[in-house]
């Protein structure tokens, strides 16, 4: 996530539409200065910055996408349109999903998060960032193998990046190539000195990482899913380098667009564990459904998922441009949505510091996000796109 830190702060049609937040054409860009990155602060509003200027912007709560690779490849400014996808108007698989939600285990999430935050930092350019990714890859691989899904075509892939820390993609094939994706980001950062200071990243985004890992484990308890008998393909993504400007997820979705991957829905889970800010504001526990820079049809569907399967309500909230990896999916023409732990203004202010620790998180609240993730994946696994 990119915002102010502590103290500094249902058949797809052939119709094509343009994301309402997108602008028509990119302006000209000043030639690349040496050792700088090109960032996009709003649609087609760019600036060349140093690495230090990147972190300064993040400390000031400024969102951005690092589009340097797009610029260097000559593809920056390409307008990727989004196909309209019709999502189910009602939940149709409660009989199968509710027993699966009973298998979600908070103790799994806690033990996984305790280990994940034990790495000194998961900064995407660090050695421990590679080590944490390797550990996570092993957990995802074990979940897939233990379910028997790998005997039916399920795979776990390391998606390589030039900075070292790789992204992780678990793919559970269905009967079609229509693909439903749940995402989180695995990297962490300490914005004061990213290469030196500790960054436990418990909430941002260790919480989302273990939330969708637990949803994957529960989902694969369905023999129908694990044996590849669902209508659609399901993927779980753990992106590298979100904190550097959505670098990992951009690379993934650029690859998917190049290879004409048929993505019907993408849901991001970034920060799922902090509820105290909501309670301190005198409000009831809820989850925050992002309503800006997202696909409105998919967002409406997710509201129905929450209402049906979660024990807490949702509230609508906004997080601005490029606030997490769902923006990369949208950028490449794939419908995406994002649900966060609370109203945006009540979310965790300890992120990007040494104080982003487990002790401040609620695993009961994370369980609500896991229920939502599980139900989202199962319902759309059988949607007649």
Swiss-Prot record:
Binds 2 Zn(2+) ions per subunit. Gene3D superfamilies: Zn peptidases. Its EC number is 3.4.11.-. Its cofactor is Zn(2+). Residues 1-14 form the signal peptide. The keyword Oxidoreductase does not apply. The keyword Secreted applies. This is Leucine aminopeptidase 1. It comes from Penicillium rubens (strain ATCC 28089 / DSM 1075 / NRRL 1951 / Wisconsin 54-1255).
């Amino acid at each position: 996530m990119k915002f102010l830190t502590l103290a500094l702060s249902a058949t797809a049609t052939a119709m094509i539409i343009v994301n309402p937040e997108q602008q028509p054409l990119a302006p000209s860009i000043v030639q690349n200065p040496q050792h700088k990155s090109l960032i996009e602060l709003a649609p087609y509003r760019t600036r060349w910055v140093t690495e230090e200027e990147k972190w300064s912007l993040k400390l000031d709560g400024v969102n951005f996408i690092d589009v340097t690779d797009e610029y260097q490849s000559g593809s920056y400014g390409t307008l990727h349109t989004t196909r309209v996808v019709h999502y189910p108007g009602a939940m149709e698989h409660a009989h199968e999903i509710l027993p699966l939600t009973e298998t979600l285990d908070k103790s799994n999430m806690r033990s996984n998060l305790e280990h994940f935050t034990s790495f000194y930092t998961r900064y995407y350019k660090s050695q421990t960032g590679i080590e944490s990714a390797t550990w996570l890859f092993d957990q995802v691989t074990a979940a897939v193998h233990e379910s028997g899904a790998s005997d039916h075509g399920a795979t776990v892939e390391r998606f390589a990046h030039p900075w070292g820390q790789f992204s992780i993609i678990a793919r559970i094939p269905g009967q079609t190539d229509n693909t439903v994706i749940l995402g989180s980001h695995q990297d962490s950062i300490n914005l004061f000195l990213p290469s030196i200071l500790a960054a436990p990243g418990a909430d941002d985004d260790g919480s989302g990482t273990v939330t969708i890992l637990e949803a994957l484990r529960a989902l694969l308890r369905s023999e129908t899913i694990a044996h590849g008998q669902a209508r659609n393909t399901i993927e779980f993504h753990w992106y590298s380098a979100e904190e550097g400007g959505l670098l990992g997820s951009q690379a993934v979705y650029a690859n998917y667009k190049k290879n004409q991957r048929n993505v019907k829905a993408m849901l991001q889970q970034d920060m799922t564990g902090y509820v105290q800010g909501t309670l301190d504001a005198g409000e009831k526990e809820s989850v925050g459904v992002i309503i800006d820079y997202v696909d409105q049809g998919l967002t409406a569907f997710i509201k129905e998922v929450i209402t049906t399967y979660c024990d807490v309500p949702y509230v609508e909230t906004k997080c601005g441009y490029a606030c997490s990896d769902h923006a990369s999916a949208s950028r490449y023409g794939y419908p995406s949505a994002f649900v966060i732990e609370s109203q945006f203004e009540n979310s965790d202010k300890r992120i990007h510091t040494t104080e982003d620790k487990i002790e401040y998180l609620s695993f009961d609240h994370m369980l609500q996000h896991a229920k939502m993730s599980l139900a989202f994946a199962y319902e759309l696994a059988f949607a007649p796109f």
